[in-house]
Amino acid sequence: RELHRLGFLDIASRRGVTVADYAQTGSLETLRAIMDFHGGLPDAKTAGSILQLRYYLEGPAMEELAARHTPADMAALQALQRQAEQAAQEGTDALAEALFRYHRGITFLSGNTITPLLFNAFTRVNLEFWKEYIQLTGIDRCLERLAQFTAHIEAGEGQAASSLLRQG
């Protein structure tokens, strides 16, 4: 019953039990079960899908925030940027956490109440992504990118911020 509830099995009367296509029948709980099985992290294909989902969620949030931000929203975003700059001096782990908070902050400040919860659901995956991103890109480039995001959002250039997000 538990495997059926998680979307791994189909149970049909008179036909019995068959293996289900969990991508079609599963839920967020299914994904968490798969990640737990793999030590809390997704395989490469699933990680790519999660990253793609992030683009789908954060890009529109950037556009929305750029279109309707208040001075308080910009102050909050700039504070998150400063926290990232300070965290960069502490090392990769601290910067990864700050980058996560900055990007989750964008979704929150956009007015969406669900997207930040989805970001929280994938905190561990996000932190691993950010650590790898920092190592590949470098701290200075990460901070430069944050400054660009903040500037585009403040200028009302949501499409530019969203495009920058996709560029990495």
Regions found by a protein language model. Give the residues of each.
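Conserved amphipathic alpha-helical segments that form helical-bundle/coiled-coil interaction surfaces
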Residues: I50-E132, C142-Q148, A160-G168
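Short helix-capping and inter-helix turn/linker motifs at the boundaries of alpha-helical repeat units
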Residues: T137-D140
